[in-house]
A protein has these predicted regions:
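Conserved cytosolic headpiece of P-type ATPases
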Residues: 1-167
Length: 167
């Protein structure tokens, strides 16, 4: 799963917004985000959990990219605090420029779940399965190429790209 953030306003206001999602093999503009779709809701929840920023009463604290994810959730009626209370963080590996990723550990549905956010190329190296409209299956080389092509397309449009995965 991939999330893209528009860089417009980044330099002048240090503010970002999420423009598109790439979920289950489809590019989805945020205006068409459907939280009744399990894959889209899953990605939204995980983008809140693997995130250190907050937006309390309009006061944004944290990295602009992470804040954009929290703001998108809020625009769709999801309170980050509620999701975080439901699945508290039990551990973390902060973002590291060598690893090019951040990892958080949560107890979800009675299981330990490590959520990882980071660079598409780095996460693809670690990914063994993919969520498609047909469910979860082994990721193929063709899947990886399609994701890499979408990543390149987003980058050519000036979008910052983040990938999410879990174990």
């Amino acid at each position: 799963s991939i999330i893209c953030s528009d860089k417009t306003g980044t330099l002048t206001q240090n503010k970002m917004t999420v423009e598109d999602y790439y979920v289950a093999g489809k590019r989805i503009p945020v205006s068409e985000l459907d939280l009744d779709d399990p894959a889209q809701r899953f990605l939204m929840d995980y983008s809140i959990l693997c995130n250190d920023s907050t937006n309390e009463n309009g006061v944004e604290i944290g990295d602009p990219t992470e804040t954009a994810l929290i703001n998108l959730a809020s625009q769709h009626g999801l309170a980050a605090a509620s999701i975080r209370n439901l699945y508290p963080r039990e551990g973390e590996l902060p973002f590291d420029s060598d690893r090019k990723m951040m990892s958080t550990l949560h107890r979800i549905d009675g299981k330990n779940r490590m959520i990882v956010k980071g660079a598409v190329d780095r996460l693809l190296e670690l990914t063994e399965q993919i969520w498609t409209h047909d469910g979860i299956r082994e990721i193929t080389e063709a899947d990886k190429i399609k994701i890499q092509q979408q990543n390149q397309s987003f980058s050519m449009e000036g979008l910052r790209v983040l990938a999410f995965t879990y174990r």
